[in-house]
């Protein structure tokens, strides 16, 4: 449960440029293509599950909502520090009564009388990176709007933000996972992401972009488990025979290798198709945001 180690390694990853692989160069990132970012996700996941989770939560849903939906001012203000690892991002969507039904969240955002800021109040749970995040992407409902709205919220304990204890998880013990409580947290109106009521769209599209990268993050673990299984089967003996020579073990290892190959093929075939569609849209004059979102949208089922 060494959360500080995860934070330190993440900061080092930022210094090496890994936290900005998906971020355009004009905002301090490397501007890599979709396939290259998938390869980085797979590579990083080979360290630990905790680092993989922290990395994915930061580079994906903790950063990309601003890259894809933020104003030019928001991107210039927040994205370079997120890409460098100076700041870390976290994504506050899930609530005690709003999981898969994300648009049913009860967190409220109330506009001040002078129209300069919103006061956000509510409870978020299972928030990855919450223990060391500097920036929260928060979703809240304004008045009785049908859909939630997204906000960029700096983590400031003096502004009504408190954290729950670290969750006692079955695995990924060094990945910070906490509840986040907002109590009349004041957020400037200029920190609204996109438009009022556009939060559910932002939330779902951000998850669409991140979902296939999560699959890539699982590939290295599949390969490592298969390799370890083969090694063990060649070492372990029963009935004076290495168990690798038993047909049942051969079948099991063959299935593991097949599953790894199929998963890898599906991930990189889909990611190359997405990259091709993004490039076509770029050449057609689409912005980075539109090209990225529309490219992923065309393969959302595969993702």
Task: Provide a role label for each language-model segment.
Residues 184-202:
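Long, acidic (Asp/Glu-rich), low-complexity accessory segments flanking structured domains
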Residues 1-47, 56-57, 69-70, 74, ...:
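Alpha-helical interface subdomain recognition
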């Amino acid at each position: 449960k060494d959360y500080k180690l995860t934070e330190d390694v993440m900061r080092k990853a930022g210094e090496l440029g890994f936290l900005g692989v998906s971020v355009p160069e004009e905002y301090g990132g490397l501007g890599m293509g979709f396939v290259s970012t998938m390869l980085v996700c797979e590579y990083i996941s080979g360290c630990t599950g905790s680092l993989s989770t922290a990395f994915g939560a930061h580079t994906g849903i903790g950063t990309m909502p601003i890259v894809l939906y933020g104003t030019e001012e928001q991107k210039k203000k927040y994205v370079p520090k997120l890409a460098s690892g100076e700041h870390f991002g976290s994504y506050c969507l899930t609530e005690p009564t709003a999981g898969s039904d994300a648009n049913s969240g009860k967190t409220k955002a109330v506009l001040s009388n002078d129209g300069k800021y919103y006061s956000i109040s509510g409870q978020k749970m299972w928030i990855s990176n919450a223990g060391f995040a500097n920036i929260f992407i928060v979703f809240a409902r304004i008045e009785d709007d049908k859909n939630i709205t997204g906000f960029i919220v700096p983590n400031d304990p003096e502004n009504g933000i408190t954290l729950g204890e670290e969750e006692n998880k079955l695995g990924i013990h060094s990945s910070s996972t906490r509840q986040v409580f907002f109590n009349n947290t004041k957020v400037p109106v200029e920190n609204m992401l996109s438009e009022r009521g556009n939060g559910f769209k932002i939330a779902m599209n951000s998850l669409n972009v991140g979902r296939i990268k999560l699959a890539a993050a699982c590939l290295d673990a599949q390969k490592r488990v298969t390799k370890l299984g083969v090694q063990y089967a060649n070492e372990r003996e029963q009935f004076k025979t290495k168990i690798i020579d038993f047909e049942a073990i051969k079948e099991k290892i063959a299935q593991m290798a097949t599953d790894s190959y199929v998963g890898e093929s599906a991930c990189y075939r889909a990611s190359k198709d997405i990259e091709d569609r993004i490039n076509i849209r770029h050449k057609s004059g689409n912005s980075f945001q539109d090209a990225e979102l529309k490219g992923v949208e065309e393969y959302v089922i595969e993702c």
